Amino acid sequence: MENPLEHLHNETHQAWEANAEVWDKRMGDEGNDFFNLLCWPALASFLPSKSDAHILDIACGNGLTTRRLAEMGYQVTAFDFSANLIEYAKQRLDKYGSKTSLHVIDATNEAQLLFLGKNKFDCALSNMALFDMANIEPLFQTLPQLLKPGGTFIFSITHPCFNNASSMHVVEEMDDGEIKTIYAIKTSRYMTPYSMRGLALRNQPKPQVYFERPLQYYLNLGFKNGFVLDGFEERAFPPETPQTTPLGWGGKFSEIPAALVIRMRLNS
């Protein structure tokens, strides 16, 4: 019998297999505003300085970050647990064949991760994926074996404080001698990890499961497995960013970070 975590993991896997086509069409080769305005600038700034570094792209989806990395000259090994997403990635990355290697691997499975090879990678990267994983402990435990001494793990996540599944976007009027419109975030859950179903794209066939964890969970898990924190950037949309919906993420929330990008380094 499946335990609750295994059940949620299997549900997540089924959701991403079902949603792969819709996700690939939406993200394409260029991604969305979350990727281009929030995540990628910080991720890119944290990458290794040597252009021939070997990077592990964790939960690569349709190959969005893989392509960017290959274009920068890096050697990239990428994987995802969705076979459907890997097929889309192969199609989009065909011309980068000499620079990229794609695999169907489950990031929650230590044995599958070790298949990639020990002391092989200068850097591991995960863009907006850790909160889609039912259990991230096997990944953090295995990365020190996959990375070279002093290697780095760079990851972006939705900001645990302000952009979690319990967050509500609020607009209010305030009068302090003049009428001001205030855009704010109201959140009711943070400290205790929990899971909740949601839609990343409104037309996706199957809801996915979000696994919400406080910031201390991610950092302490890294510290426990030999990493130190050496890069930290909270990312908010610029004020001029258009709103896709009246209360969606955009320039109206320019004082509230929607994403967080972290670099951790093995303490060699």
Residue ranges and their predicted role:
Residues 123-136:
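A short SAM/SAH-binding and catalytic strip from SAM-dependent methyltransferases
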Residues 33-52:
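Conserved alpha-helix/loop element of class I SAM-dependent methyltransferases that forms part
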Residues 113-123:
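A short acidic, Gly/Pro-enriched loop at the edge of an enzyme's catalytic core
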Residues 155-220:
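SAM-dependent methyltransferase
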Residues 1-24:
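N-terminal, positively charged/glycine-rich alpha-helical extensions of SAM-dependent methyltransferases
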Residues 54-58, 62-112:
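Class I SAM-dependent methyltransferase SAM/SAH-binding core
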